[in-house]
From Swiss-Prot:
It is found in: Secreted. It is an enzyme of class 3 (hydrolase). GO terms for biological process: lipid catabolic process. Belongs to the 'GDSL' lipolytic enzyme family. Transmembrane segments: none annotated. It comes from Arabidopsis thaliana. This is GDSL esterase/lipase At4g30140.
Length: 348
């Protein structure tokens, strides 16, 4: 996407968010159930009991969330929380870990911090739940609860996965086996091939209304700027690899939309630039809001945080603040960053 188109897209996004901020609340649940898959961007507590570095059930995470620290990788709500609100759910979709059997009739969140498309992704972080395992958990949940296929075909499904396959696999140092075996195009193809398998399994299990979130500009996160960007700017090698993946993911969406009853959509998290958020008063994009110890990416436990959190893009060195999550969720739900459908069309 050229620079002018990117600017226009995010100006529209800002307008959508401004309208959404004053719009009346949705009355009535627009879809019978909502299932969430992915990584730390969507995780809301599935990692809390795991032996992993990728868990955040401590302050200052959740400092602005009504339940406090829950395992969400932000100061407040994450993207699925806001989408659930926009779709008319009275409560956030609960994590699969610890949920009741009956909850599978309403929705579950299977996402896991450090989760990836490839099984070996994030081995450096400890225990995590890969996309393959998340799909298996979904199968177990809906079979145990005997959720009718007719109901599952009406549900909303959102998936955010792939970032860790780059951050905690392909671009790790020293080079991983994947980096030695594949060039960026080959690696993206390997990821999409696996993704296709898991999406096909979900389709067989009833998934018809599916939003696939692309990878954002992870080469511009504080973590990657400090390591691969030389501390001075975005790591373009990382961003270029992400562009290859996202392009193939869009094509995958097109392929699935040729299947009977399928309404798959791609959510573009890449095209916006930090300066585009200035229209919303979100002006700090080069550092985290919370205190992050040298060489780390997550907030230091009980460390100081910035008082003006609505001005920050990044909560820690990788994950975004609640205000950014709200902007993205509104833009994906109402347009304009989702194509060929926005999420409101999937639930209606």
């Amino acid at each position: 996407m050229v620079e002018g188109e990117s600017k226009a897209l995010w100006i529209i996004l800002a307008t959508v968010f401004a309208v959404a901020a004053v719009a009346p609340a949705v009355h009535g649940q627009q879809t019978p159930c909502y299932f969430v898959f992915g990584d730390s961007v969507f995780d809301n507590g599935n990692n809390n009991a795991l032996n992993t570095k990728a868990k955040v059930n401590y302050l200052p995470y959740g400092i602005d969330y009504f339940q406090g620290p829950t395992g969400r990788f932000s100061n407040g709500r994450n993207i699925p929380d806001v989408i659930a609100e926009l779709a008319g759910f009275n409560n956030p979709i609960p994590p699969f870990a610890g949920a009741s059997q009956a909850q599978a009739n309403i929705g579950l969140n299977y996402a896991s911090g450090a989760g990836g498309i490839r099984e070996e992704t994030s081995e450096n972080m400890g225990e995590r739940i890969s996309l393959r395992q998340q799909v298996n958990n979904h199968f177990s949940a809906i079979i145990t609860a005997a959720v009718p296929l007719s109901r599952l075909r009406q549900c909303l499904y959102t998936i955010n996965i792939g970032s860790n396959d780059y951050l905690n696999n392909y671009f790790l140092s020293p080079p991983t086996l994947a980096r030695r075996l594949f060039n960026p195009d080959q690696y993206a193809r390997s990821l999409i091939s696996l993704y296709r398998i898991y999406l096909t399994q979900l389709y067989v299990l009833g998934a018809r209304n599916v939003a696939l979130f692309g990878i954002g500009k992870i080469g511009c996160t504080p973590r990657i700027v400090a390591t691969l960007g030389g501390g001075t700017g975005c790591a373009e090698e990382v961003n270029q690899a992400v562009i290859i993946f996202n392009t193939k993911l869009k094509a995958l969406v097109t392929d699935f939309n040729n299947k009977p009853g399928a309404m798959f959509t791609y959510v573009d998290l890449f095209s916006g630039n930090a300066e585009d958020f200035a229209a919303l008063g979100i002006t700090v994009g080069d550092r985290s809001c919370c205190t992050v110890n040298p060489g780390e990416e997550l907030c230091a436990a009980n460390g100081p945080v910035c008082p003006d959190r609505n001005k920050f893009i990044f909560w820690d060195n990788v994950h975004t603040t609640e205000v950014i999550n709200t902007v993205v969720a509104n833009a994906a739900f109402n347009g304009p960053i989702a194509s060929p459908f926005n999420i409101s069309q999937l639930v209606n």
